[in-house]
C-alpha cells in the first residue's frame, strides 16, 4: 500500500549533518518470516547466528550459507509475531526464500515473505520518537499497537507495520519528513553494515562481509549449513577479504547506477569490485561498501571504473574485524 504522504528524495552534501529525525520508506528491504513448532530448531540448523539463545527483546545479525559456506543472504534476526523475522536486501529474497525452504518439508515450519510495510526511523532524536510511539524504548524489540519496533543501531529503529496502519504510524511521527530509502542506505554505509544484494549471492563467505565483527557468527553453536568453511576461515585463516567503506568523487552527470571501482597494482589497475550499496551526495561525491582483499597496502589507490580522474579512498572502519 502506497503512503498518502509525499516521499522526499534524500539528497545531502558530503559535509552536511544527517537529519536529526527522519523516516525512510524501506522498499528496498524485505522480511522473511518463520513460524511453526519447529521454527527454532529448523532455523538454528540453517544460519550462522545462535537462534536458541536469542531472547524476545533482542536482535542479532546472521547469515545463511550454501553447503560451501557462500552466503545466500545476511540479515537481522528478531522475534516477530509468533515466530521470527529476517530483515534483508529485497533483491536477494526470492533466491533466499527458495533455499531456506529447501528442507522445510521435513519440519513443522511455515516460511513466507511478509507483506508488512517497513519504515526506518533515524537520527539523534530517533530513540525519543520511538519512546513516544511505543511507550517503551528500553528493549531492542518492542511490540506496540500498530506493529513492532526494532533497534538497529543507536540512531536507527525499524518499524514493521501492517499496510492499513502505515498512515496512522506516519501521522504519529508527523514531525519527521518521510524520505526514500537512500538515507537508510547511507546509515548502513557509514556503519559498514553487512549486506548481500542479489548480484553478490554465492560470492562471499560470512567473514568477507565482516559478519564475525558484528556478532553475526556463533562459533559455539551446533552444526549448520556451511559451518565447516566458516570455522576454517576463523581457525585456519583462509579468509582473505573484508568489507570496507570507500568514498570519492563522481561525475555530477553520472547516473545513480551501481558503482564499480579499480585498484592500483604496481603501475597497473585491476578491477576492485562493485558496491554492495552506495550513496550519491549532491556535491560530486559518493560513498559505498565494497568487498576487498584484507591485506591491501595502505597506499593502494582506487578510482571509478571508466572514470580514471575520479579517485576514491578507504575510510576507517567503525569496528574491529576481530571476532573475539
From Swiss-Prot:
Keywords: Cytoplasm, Folate-binding, tRNA processing. It comes from the Bacteria. Coiled coil: none annotated. The keyword Repeat does not apply. One of its GO terms (molecular function) is folic acid binding. SUPFAM superfamilies: Aminomethyltransferase beta-barrel domain, Folate-binding domain. InterPro entries: GcvT/YgfZ_C, tRNA-modifying_YgfZ, YgfZ/GcvT, YgfZ/GcvT_CS, YgfZ_barrel. Belongs to the tRNA-modifying YgfZ family. This is tRNA-modifying protein YgfZ. It comes from Vibrio vulnificus (strain CMCP6).
